[in-house]
């Protein structure tokens, strides 16, 4: 498309598509029209440079001007974009923040746990699971929520006292604990996915011991350096912990040290220092 000015008015003059393409993509190797013999057959290998160049011209002319990729939306991974917020955690209420010594001790202990998990992963992965343990597929969000937290908690959405209605333990109802024989079978994609599922659940509900155990175990299995998705998730987790901590009435509440621990691990072990609690 060329611009022309006539009598002070700007008009747009269209040129043929071939000329427009030529202006946008000039020929690097200008080729004059080839005077080939009548016996030229573009379907056979070229015998001369002229035949080769002519064959390239023919193939280029057969290419469509616009190509549309056929994309199957079902194959696209959900939530491809990653939005990383740089906002920090909510400051701890007075008396709720842990000491620096306590935080350093938790980081050291967590590092030891991670080393042991990696060291014995092959052993625990080879152990046979109990007959009642069926791990959901990686993409089954509802299945993993029920597996980790229990069908009762996921259905009610509220935290209540545990009841012993039967002599045995019904893990389907109360959730399976993060046993080494279970978490050792989870690859990094599954670890990240389950961390996302539980973080989403936590974003709308209160903190529970079952949730805390699984979050700790998943962080222990999370490999460094962090992928962007995992980086965003753990920051989101730490911020949510700080928000829930603000709602706790007493510093003696059993949720406070658990929330402090998760904030500590995200900020000090995974190097998100802007989220760290100021030592008390």
UniProtKB/Swiss-Prot annotation:
The keyword Acetylation does not apply. Keywords: Cytoplasm, mRNA processing, mRNA splicing, Nucleus, Phosphoprotein. It is found in: Nucleus, Gem; Cytoplasm. The keyword Cytoplasm applies. Residues 1-39 are annotated as: May play a minor inhibitory role in snRNA binding to 5Sm (SNRPD1, SNRPD2, SNRPE, SNRPF and SNRPG) during snRNP assembly by inserting into the RNA binding pocket of 5Sm. InterPro entries: GEMIN2, Gemin2/Brr1. GO terms for biological process: mRNA processing; negative regulation of RNA binding; RNA splicing; RNA splicing, via transesterification reactions; spliceosomal complex assembly; spliceosomal snRNP assembly. Changing residue 213 to D: Impairs binding to SMN1. This is Gem-associated protein 2. It comes from Homo sapiens (Human).
């Amino acid at each position: 498309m060329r611009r022309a000015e006539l009598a002070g008015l700007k008009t747009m003059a269209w040129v043929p598509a071939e000329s427009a393409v030529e202006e946008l993509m000039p020929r690097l190797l200008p080729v004059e029209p080839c005077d080939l013999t009548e016996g030229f057959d573009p379907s056979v290998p070229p015998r001369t440079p002229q035949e080769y160049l002519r064959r390239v011209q023919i193939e280029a002319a057969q290419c469509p001007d616009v190509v549309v990729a056929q994309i199957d939306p079902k194959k696209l991974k959900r939530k491809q974009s990653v939005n990383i917020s740089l906002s920090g955690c909510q400051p701890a209420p007075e008396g709720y923040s842990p000491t620096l010594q306590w935080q350093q001790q938790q980081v050291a202990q967590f590092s030891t746990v991670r080393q042991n998990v990696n060291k014995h992963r092959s052993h625990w992965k080879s152990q046979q699971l109990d007959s009642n343990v069926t791990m959901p597929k990686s993409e089954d969000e509802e299945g993993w929520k029920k597996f980790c937290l229990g069908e009762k908690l996921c259905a009610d959405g509220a935290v209540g006292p545990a009841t012993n209605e039967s002599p045995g333990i019904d893990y389907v109802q109360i959730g399976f604990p993060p046993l080494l024989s279970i978490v050792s079978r989870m690859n990094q994609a599954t670890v990240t996915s389950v961390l996302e599922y539980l973080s989403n659940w936590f974003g709308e509900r209160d903190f529970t011991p079952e949730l805390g155990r699984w979050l700790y175990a998943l962080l222990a299995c999370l490999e460094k350096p962090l992928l962007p998705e995992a980086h965003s998730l753990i920051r989101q987790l730490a911020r949510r912990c700080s928000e829930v901590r603000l709602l706790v009435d007493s510093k003696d509440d059993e949720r406070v040290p658990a929330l402090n621990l998760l904030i500590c691990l995200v900020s000090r072990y995974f190097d998100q220092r802007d989220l760290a609690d100021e030592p008390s």
